[in-house]
Amino acid sequence: MTDALASQLNNTTLGDASSDAKWKEQLNVPAKDARPQTEDVTATKGLEFEDFYIKRELMMGIFEAGFEKPSPIQEETIPVALTGRDILARAKNGTGKTAAFVIPTLERINPKSTKTQALILVPTRELALQTSHVCKTLGKHLGINVMVTTGGTGLMDDIIRLNDAVHILVGTPGRVLDLASKGVADLSECPTFVMDEADKLLSPEFTPVIEQLLSFHPKDRQVMLFSATFPLIVKSFKDKHMRNPYEINLMDELTLRGITQYYAFVEEKQKVHCLNTLFSKLQINQSIIFCNSTNRVELLAKKITELGYSCFYSHARMLQQHRNRVFHDFRNGVCRNLVCSDLLTRGIDIQAVNVVINFDFPKNAETYLHRIGRSGRFGHLGLAINLINWEDRFNLYKIEQELGTEIQPIPQNIDKKLYVYDSPDTIPRPIANPSQPQITAQAANANIGERRHNHHMNGGQYQYGRGRGSYRGGRGQGQRRNMQNETKFGTQGQSSGKSHPTQVS
């Protein structure tokens, strides 16, 4: 008997480095992103994902998503999160915070259980869709079910989906509370509670909802908070609901090192003309243009389209299905320019965006920080341009003081090395729907002066034709307004030989 066991042991071969190499070779890994990166993501301890001793199936999803090595926030967070300890993490926008909490959350899920084991809360619907997509992408080999639920969609659909096993629930606070209060979403055995953009979720409008949601969780839950900014209200939440949290602060400075910031001092009526000049001179791969109100979002999008540029718009008054369509198409490169309100300032990760323009300058440093963080994602280069009028000068000074940065006047010529990549093919894009047109990397990096006169869209997407921009609206999706009562802004110049009014009226 002993001899038989010894013989069996001799014939048993343990896994070695060569077998590990084989499973990596079989992975469908995307092309390497060869763009240079800043120290925001390269200043690591030298750890590999294998050093975290996570499941091979999870590592397969990580590598197939294009990850190579953990970023600083991932190095600090993942080992601690795997132990089940509460975490309070602060890091810059675009440095890998989402994967920092998704990876340990996926590792701790038991796919054989039908219970909901993790709740991830985010403040906006677009961020919920993006976060659920990350969960599904990284966990695609784990057999885990991920569900996203947000307001603006049918409640009955969510109830039907929750009849099946849902391991990770991603959503906005109001909708999740609605489902939990009705007894549809069972969080009684949900040990993981994550809040992304926690500073927003702990604002007065959300705090009562968050505290109610915590009451549905077991007392021995793990709470993880992630954000780029932490106001004082976070401390009161930590003292009340977290147990000896591990605090991570990678914010030695507030602004991303790869983002170059400029301001242009212009009169209100000259802003569109200035924007037109920027479009004609900059090499924009994709741009996001921010306004301070939903009315101005639509008005500016209409003006941009009349100038002959392709343009999407998005704001909170649109129907959710239209917002989803705009977000999906813009991520896939269908359009080059997106005009939006602060709806898309938080967490939205679109790697191809290299220019952010504040058409309306924000009122506070927090909003400014989140806006410009839409470019220069994951240590890459980006450009932020602020159009400043006389009333904005004090806000400009205040934001510079609070962020500890200096925003320079815009030069006559902007060095393309600050925001343009020599090889645009290296910019990763999501896999687009084959039925939808997609901008090639070469076209996306070409001069933005290219005009598109037959771009037909509605519900957040303008239709250009017969010398004017038009759109179809309806209740809740951005109604056409009485333009005579609008704040007027216009252009002092012409666009490529076309005649345009100097003011919107």
From Swiss-Prot:
Q: Listed GO molecular functions?
A: ATP binding; ATP hydrolysis activity; RNA binding; RNA helicase activity
GO biological processes: mRNA processing; mRNA transport; regulation of translation
Q: What class of enzyme is it?
A: hydrolase
Q: Which family does it belong to?
A: Belongs to the DEAD box helicase family. DDX6/DHH1 subfamily.
Report whether Manganese shows up as a keyword of the record.
Answer: no
Q: Sorted alphabetically, which SMART domains does this protein's record hold?
A: DEXDc, HELICc
Please report the stretch or stretches of sequence annotated as the Helicase C-terminal domain.
258-418
Q: Where is this region: Disordered?
A: 450-505
Places the protein is found = Cytoplasm, P-body
Spell out the InterPro entries in the cross-references: DEAD/DEAH_box_helicase_dom, Helicase_ATP-bd, Helicase_C-like, P-loop_NTPase, RNA-helicase_DEAD-box_CS, RNA_helicase_DEAD_Q_motif
Task: State the protein's name.
Answer: ATP-dependent RNA helicase dhh1
- Gene3D superfamilies, per the entry: P-loop containing nucleotide triphosphate hydrolases (3.40.50.300)
Q: Where is the composition biased (Gly residues)?
A: 466-477
